[in-house]
Amino acid sequence: MRRLFLLLFMLFTTLAHAGNNPFEVKPDFLPVGKAFVFTSERLPSGETQLFWQIADGYYLYQKRLKFDGVAPELQPTLPAGEDHSDEFFGQQTVYRQGLEVKLPAAASGKVKLGWQGCADAGLCYPPQTLEVDLGGAPAVAASNVATTSNGSAQDQLLANDLQHKSWGLGLLAFFGFGLLLAFAPCSLPMLPILAGMVVGSGASPRRGLALASSYVLCMALVYAGMGVIAALLGSNLQAWLQQPWVLGSFAALFVLLSLPMFGFFELQMPALLRDRLEGASRQRQGGSLIGCGILGALSALLVGPCMTAPLAGGLLYIAQTGNALFGGLALFALGLGIGLPLLLLVTLGNRFLPKPGPWMNLLKGVFGILFLGTAIYMLRPVLNPGLWMGLWGALALVVAYCAWQQRAIAGRLLHLFGAGALLFAAWGGMLLVGAAGGGDDLWRPLKVYRGGPVANSVTAHDAFTTVKSPAELQGALDSARAQGQWVLLDYYADWCVSCKIMEKTVFGQPQVLEALKDVRLLRLDVTLDNADGRELLSRYKVPGPPSMLWIGPDGSERRSQRITGEVDANAFLQRWTQTREAR
């Protein structure tokens, strides 16, 4: 019980972000090729050594390293990095100074490497790719590659990103998650169906175990296939899931699936399908391995849509990793977790299975709260920050109410439930009060009442016109020049941490928007990897976002006043004043 409520608490606190840490203006950053100098060498042992020389003040993300073209069993083991905390992307593992990776001698052919790095001063370079020949030939071509991240609605919900070195922990987490899903309303009807096919047929214990294993393995293999597909889709799946209508649809689905957890209605497998499966199980005397396997595969396909919400969380996380091997193993582990109670049922009988009771209602409540939290989390990119914080406050009050109501079954944990209820009630109340005052900081909800301007990132977002192609940019520049208007070009990407920080700390400040009221604000979105995005970057030789360029009324850039990297509101306003006076 203690762990369950600790999990709920962590669900909220992982969304909180730290205070701002603005940097001085640093107009000159190294080109990406000098910040991260890559070399490859064929060793006498037959291995291929890959090395990145990383300049001081720069770092590479571990999770952005890709080795496309290397067989799953030959993927390299990445060395331990150092922890790095991003305000929006959470805890990350990064490499500084240098990174050495060795590909085994058995690897052959051309490999497409991918990586992404940033500067401590705030600049985030676009994702890079490089093709190398494992025979030792030099790298031949480099280009940007599409990579999107947690920010979006992202949609990662199961846990903090698990690094490559923590596969064991990740697989264990998916197995445990599957064990919980085994007692979801959609899964429970499969218990008597399989029992009727195995136990009711009079099969021996050994035969019953074989039949049940066939059922569970085939079910897990179907889930594994889902995981592999999600990993192969990778960034394409994430990019598709960033669309507002998709985020809204999934959020609505999570809310809908939370309602039966609180007893509003009952969600279960359609009676027609359940009856047909039961009939098929009765017709098979003694059962067969193939029959049980087919039944297991069908159950995964039939029950899967009924469990769309939790499955979506797992699939989204797997899509982030982009690793098909891990995706398949993770969903296979989840399927085994779902099937474990079935194996216990047919081998040990129902004596060792959990008995229905108040704990089931508690488990359903936990699922309901997690589903609601998932819905709120997914809507982050499309909601007013104040409204988003208010929704978290309302959910915290729901948690407090549920914890207070469950004190009757808490037993010796009565005081823990009571303290947890009071804690969530206090936090939820502060979130609502802060949201009502225009605040948007989950970690410090009442700071809005301390005085000083309050960021309004929605107003900032509305003030910008999003540009995604060179044609759109040229049209906007021509229009501004015809009107004798200044233009601010803001290079932005969803995977850019500093962009999201500046959205709030710079462009969300009233004094900044007031100073820019006569300036045409263009946001150049270079999130995706396509020809348009690369041309937008190359037109002004921009290394990556965040970068801000001033275009004068004559249509030419004020190059000496360019801002590259993260700055605070005061530094930004000072640069704008200098630009305006220097014309």
From Swiss-Prot:
It is a multi-pass membrane protein. One of its GO terms (cellular component) is plasma membrane. It is an enzyme of class 1 (oxidoreductase). The chain crosses the membrane at residues 168-188, 214-234, 245-265, 289-309, 326-346, 359-379, 382-402, 413-433. Its EC number is 1.8.1.8. It is found in: Cell inner membrane. It comes from the Bacteria. Pfam families: DsbD_N (PF11412), DsbD_TM (PF02683), Thioredoxin_7 (PF13899). It catalyses: [protein]-dithiol + NAD(+) = [protein]-disulfide + NADH + H(+); [protein]-dithiol + NADP(+) = [protein]-disulfide + NADPH + H(+). Residues 458-581 form the Thioredoxin domain. GO terms for molecular function: electron transfer activity; protein-disulfide reductase [NAD(P)H] activity. Disulfide bonds join 118-124, 186-306, 496-499. CDD domains: DsbDgamma. Required to facilitate the formation of correct disulfide bonds in some periplasmic proteins and for the assembly of the periplasmic c-type cytochromes. Acts by transferring electrons from cytoplasmic thioredoxin to the periplasm. This transfer involves a cascade of disulfide bond formation and reduction steps. HAMAP family: DbsD. NCBIfam families: PRK00293.1. Belongs to the thioredoxin family. DsbD subfamily. This is Thiol:disulfide interchange protein DsbD. It comes from Pseudomonas fluorescens (strain ATCC BAA-477 / NRRL B-23932 / Pf-5).
